[in-house]
Amino acid sequence: MQKKYVVALDQGTTSSRAIVFDHDANIVSVSQREFTQLYPNPGWVEHDPMEIWASQSSVLIESLARAGIHSDEVAAIGITNQRETTIIWEKDTGKPVYNAIVWQCRRSSEICEQLKAQGLEDYVRENTGLLLDPYFSGTKIKWILDNVPDARAKAKRGELLFGTVDTWLLWKLTEGKVHVTDPTNAARTLLFNIHSLSWDTKLLEALDIPAAMLPEVKPSCSVYGTTRIAGEGSEIPLAGIAGDQQAALFGQLCVEPGMAKNTYGTGCFLLMNTGNKAVRSSHGLLTTVAVGAQGEVNYALEGSVFMGGATIQWLRDELGLIRDASDTEYFASKVADTNGVYLVPAFVGLGAPYWDPNARGALFGLTRGANRNHIIRAALESIAYQSKDLLDAMIKDSGERLKSLKVDGGAVANDFLMQFQADITDVEVLRPSVCETTALGAAFLAGLAVGFWTSVTELKYKACIDKHFKPNIDASQRERLYAGWQDAVARTRS
């Protein structure tokens, strides 16, 4: 049968999805299944690894059935995944020794403090590009080995395997034949030296993690093994892996230095490609691994906005100013500006480039003439201002000129927000026709690995732009608006 399709497995924090793409990068079918979130203690977040696998394998089968596609028509399967989430299982039985500890989980905070006390903070920053934080996998591994009965002894005997979610899915899809990850996921473990592109012996020793547990690291654009869907049909190559944010960067074809993307979700995730240069940030950004045009390792700067879409949820759920997130564009467009109102949504503190956990949200500039429309507009503008804060930090750190800003995520449907983002950053904002860029990135990597597509040049004709948003205000207005934002932020921190 002719190979007509590539399937992307998109394993996220709350659901598992499978998306089928044709040769023109059009979506043919989507299947999605949510799974259980476990909160055994305050600040702890877990998933059942077997439920992750069951949900992901079922949507893979379902996505083909919905489209009426035979598995023999599938050229390759790519994987993208929630990063940092940690799974440890028995090599012989494939049975997890504990639930998956999710990236959001804070239980290993004390281990991070111990590493800081050992003077490892700067070493971690220099060699992994990360901060010493329970967000990343390394301290989660140590917690499992320290707290699950007999786990450390088994690990030292070579009986246990570790993997992030990509590795777990590969292991299951190949029936235990392949124990592999890619550099984008390895770089989020706190154990991977992003310069030598190898596991860091000093950090493994500091956390007392046996190297034999760790997966082999192979390029993001590779064939790792094969699988049969539901045990039927021919073997399908498993080819192409990237963590979710790096997959979105590749799906947007940000493969050259200075190219950046912003994913607008509950928060916002911004990544800028810095080419073959691992830039150490002086603004609190992370240095991480990305994927280049030939599938080679590139580097990127990464920063996140804590309150993106969550700010709009606050307008809806706590203030009752809107019924639906889509209402914000209508109300914001009813006024010419915010009437001097600024909202700083520091509800959980401020992230990069401020890193101020004590800052709190505030509304500034309220007068008797301020109304609902002004507050809603200020909320939307706050998302763009926070994104500009990060983009400016990336430009200063990298020395790269921002060529354009590629965007994806739910909020990109809001034309007002996209236009204001272009205005305040003074750069063209590009919204793709296919906003499923995370899955598209995994599909592109898989398709390139097996020759379904020949090059990134060919992909540029597949990744179409839906709309260009060009800056539409003058420099003096931009400077005045942003100065007002900076003043508001400063006052939330005093």
Curated annotation (Swiss-Prot):
Sites binding ADP sit at 13, 17, 266, 309, 410, 414
| Listed GO CC annotations | cytosol
Report the catalytic activity: glycerol + ATP = sn-glycerol 3-phosphate + ADP + H(+)
Which SUPFAM superfamilies does the UniProt entry name for this protein? Actin-like ATPase domain (SSF53067)
Activity regulation, free text: Inhibited by fructose 1,6-bisphosphate (FBP).
Record-listed E.C. numbers? 2.7.1.30
Which residues belong to the signal peptide in this entry? none
Keywords from the named record = ATP-binding, Glycerol metabolism, Kinase, Nucleotide-binding, Transferase
Pfam families (UniProt xref): FGGY_C (PF02782), FGGY_N (PF00370)
Which pathway does the record list? Answer: Polyol metabolism; glycerol degradation via glycerol kinase pathway; sn-glycerol 3-phosphate from glycerol: step 1/1
Q: Does the keyword Transferase apply?
A: yes
A single GO BP term for this record reads:
glycerol metabolic process
PANTHER family (UniProt xref): GLYCEROL KINASE, SUGAR KINASE
NCBIfam families assigned: glycerol_kin (TIGR01311), PRK00047.1 (NF000756)
Chain's role: Key enzyme in the regulation of glycerol uptake and metabolism. Catalyzes the phosphorylation of glycerol to yield sn-glycerol 3-phosphate.
Q: Which family does it belong to?
A: Belongs to the FGGY kinase family.
For this entry, the protein name equals Glycerol kinase
- Source organism per entry reads Shewanella sp. (strain ANA-3)
Q: Name the gene that codes for it.
A: glpK
